[in-house]
From Swiss-Prot:
It comes from Pongo abelii (Sumatran orangutan). Disulfide bonds: none annotated. It catalyses: uroporphyrinogen III + 4 H(+) = coproporphyrinogen III + 4 CO2; uroporphyrinogen I + 4 H(+) = coproporphyrinogen I + 4 CO2. NCBIfam families: hemE. The gene is UROD. It is found in: Cytoplasm, Cytosol. The modification N-acetylmethionine is found at M1. Coproporphyrinogen III binds at R37, A39, R41, D86, Y164, S219, H339. The record marks D86 as: Transition state stabilizer. The lineage of its organism: Eukaryota, Metazoa, Chordata, Craniata, Vertebrata. One of its GO terms (biological process) is protoporphyrinogen IX biosynthetic process. GO terms for cellular component: cytosol. SUPFAM superfamilies: UROD/MetE-like (SSF51726). This is Uroporphyrinogen decarboxylase.
Length: 367
């Protein structure tokens, strides 16, 4: 630490590094915890912000992104913050129009329909400059955090981004995106490469701006079986990690732990553990002990309480957390949900989850 109390890049010195130490596989006094979508509509104060009304314009405002990022930390003793943004800012930066439709979610008025549509996408090298507003939000938020906890940056993985760009929004089947994989494999690989080439400088830029960890969301992994996943998702997941780490070294930036969260991708846990990430995120469909058997002791696991468990009583939440912690054990583990928080969840129950993790994980280490 410098004499003025500032760490590298002039940011305030980090006071709670429990999350980072767990991510790197080091011993911790308790199990760190954060929640996917911890900045969100379940908080009354979030619903009063501009983000609740005009989502993507909020994403483009560093000040407007900073506030919802900090809101959950004012309520709960979380061990990490995650920047308020969206995975779909990358397709936007590639030149696609994306709107947020109330009650429906993201919508692409002109999705990719033909191979020649790829020619309309911007050069992936310009994406990072188009997303400078995200970097500004990260720097501002890192300053405002004042070293309280680490700040996580994130992006969507190539396959997941491709699904939105081809489907035109969410889908229960991803039939159009998978149709591309079967009918246009070469064009699919071309699109996935474009996305990978856009993601790498974007993620490196987040670290340069102040992000202390990175999470890659492969939210639609479950729509691919083992064969399609190994062909169209896993190679690009690996390449993102490899290239980000190499570029950080080239830029003289310190390495940061990287997390891969492939929802419903339990069929590929062993491969994901060897994909170059320090942490593998789990959804609630995989048993902790089975997951540990698959990944071994070389990576940290993150997850994996069913988000709907937070609809239970606070007492039952405590029991479920205790069971989860017992199953994962105290080493190489970060507590989280198996997916994001839902808008109708009770903040008190989120607090009960966080408190239970801290309480039971300390007891676990005493025994």
């Amino acid at each position: 630490m410098e004499a003025n109390g500032l760490g590298p890049q002039g940011f305030p010195e980090l006071k709670n590094d429990t999350f980072l130490r767990a991510a790197w596989g080091e011993e911790t006094d308790y199990t760190p915890v954060w929640c996917m979508r911890q900045a969100g509509r379940y908080l009354p104060e979030f619903r009063e912000t501009r983000a609740a009304q005009d989502f993507f314009s909020t994403c483009r405002s560093p000040e407007a992104c900073c506030e919802p990022t900090l809101q959950p930390l004012r309520r709960f003793p979380l061990d990490a913050a995650i920047i308020f943004s969206d995975i779909l800012v990358v397709p936007q930066a590639l030149g696609m129009e994306v709107t947020m439709v109330p009650g429906k979610g993201p919508s692409f008025p002109e999705p990719l329909r033909e191979e020649q549509d790829l020619e309309c996408l911007r050069d992936p090298e310009v994406v990072a400059s188009e997303l400078d507003y995200v970097f500004q939000a990260i720097t501002l938020t890192r300053q405002r955090l004042a070293g309280r906890v680490p700040l996580i940056g994130f992006a969507g993985a190539p396959w997941t981004l491709m699904t939105y760009m081809v489907e035109g929004g969410g889908s229960s089947t991803m039939a159009q995106a998978k149709r591309w994989l079967y009918q246009r494999p070469q064009a699919s690989h071309q699109l996935l490469r474009i996305l990978t080439d856009a993601l790498v400088p974007y993620l490196v830029g987040q670290v340069a701006a102040g992000a202390q960890a990175l999470q890659l969301f492969e939210s639609h992994a479950g729509h691919l079986g083992p064969q399609l996943f190994s062909k169209f998702a896993l190679p690009y997941i690996r390449d993102v990690a490899k290239q980000v780490k190499a570029r950080l070294r080239e830029a003289g930036l310190a390495p940061v732990p990287m997390i891969i969260f492939a929802k419903d991708g339990h069929f590929a846990l062993e491969e994901l553990a060897q994909a170059g990430y320090e942490v593998v995120g789990l959804d609630w469909t995989v048993a902790p002990k089975k997951a540990r058997e698959c990944v071994g002791k070389t990576v940290t696991l993150q997850g994996n309480l069913d988000p709907c468990a937070l609809y239970a009583s606070e007492e039952e939440i405590g029991q479920l957390v205790k069971q989860m912690l017992d199953d994962f054990g105290p080493h190489r583990y970060i507590a989280n949900l198996g997916h994001g928080l839902y808008p109708d969840m009770d903040p008190e129950h989120v607090g009960a989850f966080v408190d239970a993790v801290h309480k039971h994980s300390r007891l676990l280490r005493q025994n």
